[in-house]
Design a protein with these regions (language model features):
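Positively charged n-region of N-terminal signal peptides that target proteins for export
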Residues: 1-7
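Bacterial N-terminal signal peptides
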Residues: 8-20
Length: 535
């Protein structure tokens, strides 16, 4: 990667910035009055903790004012990046589509509406890739979020955005009724031909589709029943005919651990699902949100739309599930005069904010396909990643420090040097301030809301988190394959910096919250130390 020419003293320091437990190099000999040397002294106790003895650290702090690195540790080594990948995914969408881009979800009629209000034809919702056909819609053309997104379920701190998850679907149905439609003789369809539906994103396993209703999730809030042995309480949102839940989970004594599973998921002949809830939930424990990922998002949306139409007094029949296939003959009807309902999304800038603040895997995984569909739909030789690569190459970035196969970070690797140079590139763009504000804020919101909330750096470090972990059966513990942090801060002295912090392969206990408590807080300490030390 092209780097600014540095003085011999700076280059010597960068080469010596690691100690043996961090990568095998010699300890720095620079005077303790040097900010980088003082930073090294502050970081060493963090990285020398016993829990990191088998881990590998990679760090770079980059001066945006001087266009040069001021501290680096293993800067050119590739690290498993996890959700810091979303910095590239969202940045690409922001640069190529623009902050003001809006999704237009239209509902078309394929036939005439007679005087009695009968639509003699089909009603077709054409999916536009809008990722927020949900209750995220807020006043002022904005999108809401909670710090612990409902996609990361089964955690006591997880919650859904307050409001109606079918808000947009109901609004579309109301518009159809307002057009005088009282009965539909044809089918109610959802056209998802924008890109192929069916693949599951690599983070939380939600099915990707051009239509996204409530993040393609059904939220179940499960709590204890009235007594030990009683059935648990279950609140479903949204409740539709697409899925029926059979509750076989029971209430256990206080002090036990909640354990809820979907023990079976049966597809019925009509395309609906019957899901059995099994497991236990203890007395005295606050209800917890669990999310069911719908297997066929287009069918889910179709059922929800038919339900909403009926609520508005429109007679509509739910077609057989097999009808929801192939849309080659429909686009001829997609003309302005046939629009009977339309939803225009808030600007893309709001979507970028949601994806980055809460690390929304479905949204990030879908963005490369959306960018491709919008900008190069008819060019079968190009993918969304081809468009991203072209942007990065035009920026002059060395892609030898980057590997990416999905939008969310389920399988991606970046070097700290590549990441800070990418962030430096984004900091020079017209939407730089918007991009930075969209990042989680240390100790304040998003996935950093509970990281280092009481240090001077809290409220001043804007950075995307990344976490990838799996069960280590041999040692009965959790292996944090990757933990990362990438973003920006302005020092108390007014200097601007980009940062990339990675640590790979850290073993932690299975206790809930151990990854955040041990590894997440440590990365926050590193960022906070840089904020307090660099000029």
């Amino acid at each position: 990667m092209p780097r600014s020419v540095q003085s011999p003293l700076v280059l010597a320091f960068l080469a010596l910035a690691a100690v043996p437990s961090w990568g095998g190099a010699q300890a720095p000999t620079a005077a303790p009055t040097d900010p980088a040397a003082r930073l090294t002294q502050r970081l060493r106790p963090i990285m020398d903790r016993p829990e990191f003895r088998h881990a590998t650290w990679g760090i770079e702090f980059y001066s945006l004012d001087e266009d040069r690195p001021v501290y680096a540790l293993n800067p050119d080594q590739l690290f498993t990046a996890a959700s810091t990948t979303k910095l590239l995914t969202t940045g690409t969408a922001l640069r190529l589509l623009g902050a003001d881009y809006r999704f237009h979800t239209n509902v078309y009629r394929t036939g005439p509406i007679d005087r009695a209000g009968t639509l003699k034809g089909d009603l077709v919702l054409v999916a536009s890739g809008d990722l927020n056909l949900s209750g995220r819609i807020q006043p002022g053309d904005t999108l809401g979020f909670t710090n612990e997104d409902h996609a990361y379920d089964a955690d006591p701190s997880t919650s859904a955005v307050p409001g109606d998850p079918l808000l947009v679907i109901r609004q579309l149905a109301a518009q159809v009724a307002a057009h005088g439609v009282k009965r539909i003789t044809g089918r109610v369809l959802v056209d998802v031909s924008m890109f192929r539906e069916g693949a599951r994103e690599l983070g939380t396993g939600v099915v990707m589709s051009p239509v996204v209703v409530n993040d393609n999730l059904v939220d179940l809030t499960i709590g204890p029943g009235a007594s030990v042995g009683a059935a648990t309480t279950v609140a479903i949102s949204p409740a539709t005919a697409y899925v029926r839940f059979v509750n076989k989970s029971t209430t256990t004594a206080a002090g036990t651990t909640p354990s809820i599973t979907w023990s079976s998921d049966v597809t019925e002949p009509d395309g609906s699902h019957t899901v059995t809830i099994s497991g236990r939930f203890p007395m005295g424990t606050k209800a917890i949100l669990y999310s069911y990922a719908v297997p066929e998002p287009s069918r889910f949306a179709q059922v929800a739309l038919v339900q909403a139409l009926r609520e508005k007094g429109v007679t509509a029949t739910l077609p057989a599930a097999s009808v929801q296939k192939g849309f080659t003959s429909l686009p001829a009807a997609y003309r302005p005069e046939n629009v009977v309902a339309e939803h225009v999304s808030p600007p893309l800038a709001e979507e970028i904010k949601v994806t980055l603040k809460v690390s929304q895997n479905l949204h990030a995984s879908s963005l490369p396909m959306i960018v491709k569909a919008v900008l190069a739909r008819d060019d079968t030789s190009k993918t969304g990643f081809d468009l991203e690569r072209g942007m990065l190459q035009t920026a002059g970035l060395d892609l030898g420090g980057a590997q990416q196969t999905d939008g969310a970070g389920g399988d991606a690797r970046f070097s700290p040097s590549f990441m800070v140079h990418y962030l430096a590139y984004m900091a020079k763009q017209k939407d730089a301030a918007l991009f930075e504000r969209s990042l989680p804020i240390l100790g304040r919101d998003g996935t950093l809301w509970n990281i280092q909330p009481d240090v001077p750096a809290a409220g001043h470090v804007f950075a995307k988190t990344g976490t990838l972990a799996g069960y280590d059966a041999l040692n009965r513990q959790l292996l944090v394959t990757a933990k990362g942090l990438g973003g920006y801060f302005t020092s108390p002295g007014g200097k601007r910096y980009a940062l990339a912090i990675y640590v790979n392969n850290v073993s932690v206990p299975l206790d809930q919250g151990a990854t955040t408590k041990i590894v997440g807080q440590a990365l926050g300490e590193v960022a906070a130390a840089a904020y307090a030390t660099l000029p």
